[in-house]
Swiss-Prot record:
HAMAP family: KdpA (MF_00275)
Task performed by this protein: Part of the high-affinity ATP-driven potassium transport (or Kdp) system, which catalyzes the hydrolysis of ATP coupled with the electrogenic transport of potassium into the cytoplasm. This subunit binds the periplasmic potassium ions and delivers the ions to the membrane domain of KdpB through an intramembrane tunnel.
Keywords: Cell inner membrane, Cell membrane, Ion transport, Membrane, Potassium, Potassium transport, Transmembrane, Transmembrane helix, Transport
Transmembrane segments: 6-26, 60-80, 128-148, 167-187, 247-267, 276-296, 331-351, 361-381, 383-403, 423-443, 492-512, 530-550
Protein name: Potassium-transporting ATPase potassium-binding subunit
Superkingdom field: Bacteria
The UniProt record lists the keyword NADP: no
Location(s), subcellular: Cell inner membrane
Coiled coil residues, start to end: none
One GO cellular component term noted in the UniProt record for this chain: plasma membrane
GO MF, any single term: P-type potassium transmembrane transporter activity
Length: 566
């Protein structure tokens, strides 16, 4: 029956590539400013779309100011939602610390949720606040990816682009059209789209039930396309009003990685060599496939505690088998395992099953995918430029081995670039490890744990890995709505996002000044199986050296203990 999981993974990858290829071609027009003439004429009448080129410092300042202003407005919207319209359930104002945490979460594309959406936020807060920032945070990540692409393929300090123009075009010409089509499809499939607060129906026991509704389809579309992940409902994509059918589940999985995959194809075309984009796509695809198969295998083994209770966990024609705790029967084991892989490989964080109920090894894989820096496809834009940091490190190490100055696409990778690469690669793991250590030492952190021992440590490690790498998913046994967790995780989300984004922009600013050097016999070919293997090795080596000690205290020891005692 494992063949069913392999077939699902294979069909998923084929559909993803078929859809990503034309989208990647379309994205090259946004990178290269090749728009239809009529659009250029329309933009010429919009004052802030004067396409004056920015230096990297100006671009970075624009991104920071834009996001800080957005966070302030979102914070105020939630802080005073009780006095604002479109609040049919008369939900109270959100507490200041939770509002601050949520605002930072959504501007950083993390979408960490320390609240239940249907009982905490009004439709106005969900639509005007969260949904808007789902678009803007995604556009910010893609814009920074565009800047690095231009830096690698152009020469001249005034060729990096304009932040306002990039964000406008990405939002209006890419994200909005795709989201409208996607939302209509979701609504047709049964995803709720209503301004009604709730509907009352008689339950099976005769007691009236109040079922919350809301403008879900419109938020769900960009939630997945923008690798945001924050659900309208607390159950996220496990909720039938967000993800009702096997078809919507498959489409949601494809939509998570659609833009990240398309950016790899786009990069190859912008660089004038499709092979460099394909190398990144192969690297990410191999790592994703291996991770998915590992989770499927781990979950298919079942749970030893349930086995001792004589619970039937065997696969058959009438049940998925394996560890079905925390999973929806309409999706089954294979689709739930693949979704868990995809959502943590990307910085999405949406879930269609409870990750806290995964087996120890099944929960280990999503944790590792986040700890690698969200570079296995990763978030829209951020996954691509995060992987490029590893690419620069790989060519640097290769250059050291053969005694040549490292270069990529004909541009030399020198001391300044490697300093920025080091900063970008070290900040997220440092935040994860220091934050986790602080949380398990201080009583203010320990009060959030409902579990003790290895699993309790795993819950805390997962939370800080998710926040620092802007994923947003969680092991749900952790109570994160405390002053300590709200403040600490907000700091991690902000620094984890901009602590990587700013070094990437600095690298772009340095590379744009350099001229392309012609390739020689000693130049490293940045494509082909050898380069893909080297890149995978560097990514795994950095992750293994950094996190194996922490993982040994959590999921690894939990697995050994669980299977030994049962």
């Amino acid at each position: 029956m494992f063949s069913s999981g392999v077939a699902l993974l294979t069909s998923y990858m084929l559909v993803l590539l078929l859809l990503a290829w034309p989208l990647g071609i379309a994205l090259t027009r946004l990178v290269d400013d090749r728009l239809p003439l009529w659009l250029i004429r329309v933009e010429s009448h919009i004052k802030f779309l004067e396409n004056s080129q920015m230096k990297w410092q100006t671009y970075a300042a624009a991104i920071l100011v834009f996001n800080l202003l957005g966070a302030a407005l979102l914070f105020l919207l939630m802080l005073f939602q009780g006095s604002l319209p479109l609040n049919p359930l008369h939900l109270p104002d959100v507490s200041p610390l939770l509002a601050m945490n949520t605002a930072i979460s959504f501007i950083t594309n993390t979408n960490w949720q320390a609240y239940a959406g249907e009982t905490t936020l009004s439709p106005l807060s969900q639509m005007l606040g969260l949904t808007v920032h789902n678009f803007l945070s995604a556009a910010n990540g893609i814009a920074v990816a565009f800047v690095l692409m231009r830096a690698l393929t152009r020469t001249g300090s005034q060729q990096l682009g304009n932040a306002w123009v990039d964000i406008w075009r990405i939002t209006v010409y890419l994200l909005l059209p795709l989201s409208v089509i996607y939302a209509l499809f979701l609504a047709q499939q049964g995803v709720v789209q209503s301004l009604m607060a709730q509907i009352s129906v008689p339950g099976l026991s005769g007691v009236e039930q109040h079922i919350p509704l809301g403008p879900v389809a419109s938020q769900e579309a960009i939630k997945m396309l923008g690798t945001n992940g924050g659900g309208y409902f607390n159950a996220n994509s496990a909720h039938p009003f967000e993800n009702p059918t096997a078809l919507t589940n498959f489409v949601q999985m494809v939509s998570i990685l659609l833009i990240p995959a398309a950016l790899c194809i786009c990069f190859g075309r912008v660089a004038g060599d499709n092979r460099v984009g394909s190398a990144l796509l192969w690297t990410m695809g191999i790592m994703l496939s291996v991770a998915a198969l590992l989770i499927m295998w781990a979950e298919s083994q079942g749970h030893p505690v349930l086995a001792n209770l004589a619970v039937d966990q065997q696969m058959s024609a009438i049940q998925s088998g394996g560890n079905m705790e925390g999973k929806e029967t309409r999706f089954g084991l294979w689709a739930s395992s693949l979704f868990a892989t995809i959502t943590t490989a990307a910085s999405c964080g949406a879930v269609n099953a409870m990750h806290d109920s995964l087996t120890p090894l099944g929960g280990l894989i999503p944790m590792v995918l986040m700890q690698l820096g969200e570079v296995v496809f990763g978030g829209v834009g951020s996954g691509w430029y995060g992987m490029m940091l590893f690419v620069f490190l790989t060519v640097f190490l290769a250059g050291l081995m053969i005694g040549r100055t490292p270069e990529y696409l004909g541009k030399k990778i020198e001391i300044y670039e490697m300093k920025m690469v080091t900063i970008g690669l070290l900040i997220p793991p440092a935040l994860v490890l220091l934050g986790t250590a602080l949380a398990v030492i201080l009583p203010q952190g320990l009060v959030s744990l409902q579990e003790s021992g290895a699993h309790g440590f795993s819950e805390m490690l997962y939370a800080f890995s998710s926040a620092a790498n802007n994923n947003g998913s969680a092991f749900a046994g952790l109570n994160s709505n405390t002053p300590f967790m709200n403040i600490t995780l907000a700091v991690l989300m902000f620094v984890g996002r901009f602590g990587v984004m700013l070094p990437v922009l600095a690298i772009a600013g340095a590379l744009i000044e350099k001229r392309h050097q012609p390739a020689s016999a000693g130049s490293l070919a940045c494509h082909g199986p050898l380069f893909v293997g080297m890149l995978i090795g560097v990514v795994l080596l950095i992750g293994a050296l950094t996190f194996i000690p922490a993982l040994a205290l959590g999921p690894i020891v939990e697995h050994l203990t669980l299977w030994q005692t049962h």
